[in-house]
Amino acid sequence: MTNPIKLIIADDEMLIRTGLKIMLEASGNVEVLALAESGRAAFEACKEHQPDVVLMDIRMPESNGIEGTKLIKEAFPEVKVLIVTTFQDTEYIVEAVQNGASGYLLKDSSPDAILDGIKVALSGKVVMDTVISEALLTNTTVEKPATFDAEKWGLTPREVEL
């Protein structure tokens, strides 16, 4: 038997924390070490336990998931933080990933999808729900003007303008 995945779950709603715990432990390959109600509480739990992964909600009182992710990744860079939330806000997604999150899943994902996401994050890859990927691609445009060396091609300023 392989070692179970050691997990901390952070969500301000007790029903969600408990539901995720029951669902993931039923897989037989996950051990939930602690439940936390804020990002700071998840960070404190990481100090006490040595998790492989933290499942983190994004919007929580006291210390949200982005702040919690930043604290955890600064102190424990080897711990994977996976955001699991109902929010598809691209601003939160980008900020969470910039602060070290290994991915972003929606709470309405199937139990198998969440477990698969945990495994993918542990393998070092970024996890992104399809709905979130589409939102990022639709709402994010990169405006980069084309550049080239006009002198190299012997173009006048007017020719470059055209």
Q: Would you name each region that the model predicts?
A:
Residues 11, 57, 85:
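Active-site residues of response regulator receiver
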Residues 16, 35, 61-63:
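Residue-level signal for the "D+5" position in two-component response regulator receiver
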Residues 29-37, 45:
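Short hydrophobic/Thr-rich beta-strand motif most characteristic of the beta2 strand and flanking loop
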Residues 38-41, 62-67:
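Acidic catalytic/metal-coordinating carboxylates
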Residues 44, 66-78:
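Short amphipathic alpha-helix used as the core "switch/output" element in two-component signaling
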Residues 49-55:
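Active-site beta3 strand of CheY-like receiver
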Residues 137-161:
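Regulatory hinge/linker segments at domain boundaries
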